[in-house]
Structures are given as structure tokens and as C-alpha cells.
């Protein structure tokens, strides 16, 4: 995928996140798995992000492919994530996937929940 094509996507999937997903899928020996990101009610700011691995792509789901792996977002969650970026970090505070969300007006201290 080119940078130009990447710029037109409603949600981006960073190289770091794609590389981590690829490594995890190799460990699981299941290339059919995809990283699903979703938004649910809850957390200290109203909404929270969730991540899970899923073999299915449901009707209406939006997918982004990078480095041979897929990120999947359901239509309800996508409306809160448009313009966002799924990334991965590893540091002293642990390792995790996270969302850089330009739609979030407030976030909690750990970045796991947000409001719009």
C-alpha cells in the first residue's frame, strides 16, 4: 500500500502494529486471524477501545491490509475511529496496541477510554 492510498483510508494501521500482529500470527500458526479493533461503552471517559483476534470478517466490516495481515473494524466502531491510527508500543509501562484518535475530545490517563 502506498502512502497516498494510506492517506485516503478512514483508519490507519502502522508498520509497528502490523509487524506485531504478523509476529503473533506466526506464533499462533494461524494466518487466518485478523486484529479486530472495536469501541464499546465504558471506561472512565465514556467509550473504550478493545482489541481481539478474529478469523471472520463480517458483512459491513472495514478492513485494512498491511504487511500481509489485516485490521478489521465493524461499522459502528468505525464511526468513532475515522481518521485514527492503530499503533503498537512496547516500553517500561508494558506492551500494547493503542489508538491515536483525533475524534476523542478527552481521554483517560492510560489512553484506554475516551469521549467524543
From Swiss-Prot:
Q: What cofactor is this protein dependent on? A: iron-sulfur cluster
Q: Which GO terms describe its cellular component?
A: cytosol
What's in the keyword line of the UniProt record?
Answer: Iron, Iron-sulfur, Metal-binding
Q: Name one GO molecular function term.
A: iron ion binding
> Subunit structure, per the record?
Homodimer.
Q: What does this protein do?
A: Required for insertion of 4Fe-4S clusters for at least IspG.
Q: What is this protein called?
A: Iron-sulfur cluster insertion protein ErpA
Give the organism the record lists: Shewanella oneidensis (strain ATCC 700550 / JCM 31522 / CIP 106686 / LMG 19005 / NCIMB 14063 / MR-1)
Q: Gene encoding this polypeptide?
A: erpA
Amino acid at each position: 500500500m502506498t502512502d497516498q492510498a494510506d492517506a485516503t483510508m478512514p483508519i490507519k494501521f502502522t508498520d509497528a502494529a502490523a509487524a506485531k500482529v504478523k509476529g503473533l500470527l506466526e506464533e499462533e500458526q494461524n494466518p487466518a486471524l485478523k486484529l479486530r479493533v472495536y469501541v464499546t461503552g465504558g471506561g472512565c471517559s465514556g467509550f473504550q477501545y478493545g482489541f481481539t483476534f478474529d478469523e471472520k470478517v463480517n458483512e459491513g466490516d472495514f478492513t485494512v491490509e498491511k504487511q500481509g495481515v489485516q485490521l478489521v473494524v465493524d461499522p459502528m466502531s468505525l464511526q468513532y475511529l475515522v481518521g485514527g491510527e492503530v499503533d503498537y508500543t512496547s516500553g517500561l509501562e508494558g506492551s500494547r496496541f493503542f489508538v491515536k484518535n483525533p475524534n476523542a475530545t478527552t481521554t483517560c490517563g492510560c489512553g484506554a477510554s475516551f469521549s467524543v
